[in-house]
Amino acid sequence: MSSTPVTLKAVQSEVSARNAKSSEAEVKRCEDLILSYAKQLAKEKDITGIRTLVKSIQNFYDLVGKARASKLIRDIVEFALTVEQGKQEKEEKIDLLKNCIEWATSNKREFLRRSLQARLVRLYNDVREFTEGQKLGQELSKELKKLEDRELLIEVSIEESKCAFNLNNLSKAKTALLTAKTSSNSAFASPQLQAAVDMQSGVLYSAEERDYKTSFSYFYEAFEGYGSIGDKVNATGALKYMILCKIMLNETEQIPAMLSTKEVLPYNTSPRIVAIRAMADAFRKRSLKDFMKALEEHKKELVEDKVVAVHSQNLERTMLEKEISRVIEPYSEIELSYIARVIGMTVPPTEKAIARMILDKKLMGSIDQHGDTVVIYPKAGATKQFTRALTTIRELTKTVDVSYSRTKVIK
């Protein structure tokens, strides 16, 4: 294929020249030209151009037959979905898929319509439109169960589970994952789908059960599965969550050895692995400052990733509370500004954390709003004076009771 840029006019000319009498070689050349143009448009981030292409070659779909046309449309759509997305690109991708689904529906291309809808569910997850993804996923799952299209059902159920997880509905997430597992056990599932099932299983075990050992095993299976088919992107994601499990198991000292193995070494420079390693290093050093720095510098990987965020928030809170407890321990009253300065934070979040500790009864004390100080109460039963006072009160009570009894007898 020539390196000269392809034009829409050239594609349309080639398509119009093809008819039922065209040879297989001519049809194949036309297909290659269409895909080359779609790839070119994707590099130019021209999703609108791809949508125009899809519409302008509709006559060609009838010429090549349903199965071949379906594959061609899906390939063109995939090129469009590789475009890096801002808000505009996100909307354009969704519109492109919806338009293709409408065409498939109106032309009774049911298999194509279902496969495109499944891809749209995955796109909704990618662009964080979880409510829309869950709605479409549930509708499509019902249809696929009736048709017993198990492979597509596995794919849709996994995406449906992801939607529910991101919407904090763990019950629905587990139900959808169970559907995917049941389908994969009763029918052949591709390595890609089996790895996806393992990955989502690890996510839910870590989020709900807090069973990080089992989660690690699932993530490792997913890592191996994705690695075996050369899916480096998803394999990196699985490795990232393996490291997260080691952090949650308080086994961060094992991470360097794990990352030095032959199968893992190629992934070490990935931004996702660099980010989770920064969090692991901060946790190992018990440094709240470094932990907060890691979250700030790697916001996309550690804060916007729901799987990590569920656990990093708990880790951050635990580390912050330990730091505050360590600072205030020697004092009966201490300035908020001093606590904030020592732990490397500003006063407002420090005050908020202390207020939460007081409400959770993790700290016996109060915040003096006038003096901007924290007053720490002595622990009940912690002083000898308090114990002696209780003993004295008990003895006095006995004396009063005896005196009262004697008074009644005298009367």
UniProtKB/Swiss-Prot annotation:
GO terms for molecular function: structural molecule activity. Pfam families: PCI, RPN6_N. InterPro entries: 26S_Proteasome/COP9_Components, PCI_dom, Rpn6_N, WH_DNA-bd_sf. Keywords: Proteasome. The keyword Coiled coil does not apply. Component of the lid subcomplex of the 26S proteasome, a multiprotein complex involved in the ATP-dependent degradation of ubiquitinated proteins. In the complex, rpn-6.2 is required for proteasome assembly. This is Probable 26S proteasome regulatory subunit rpn-6.2. It comes from Caenorhabditis briggsae.
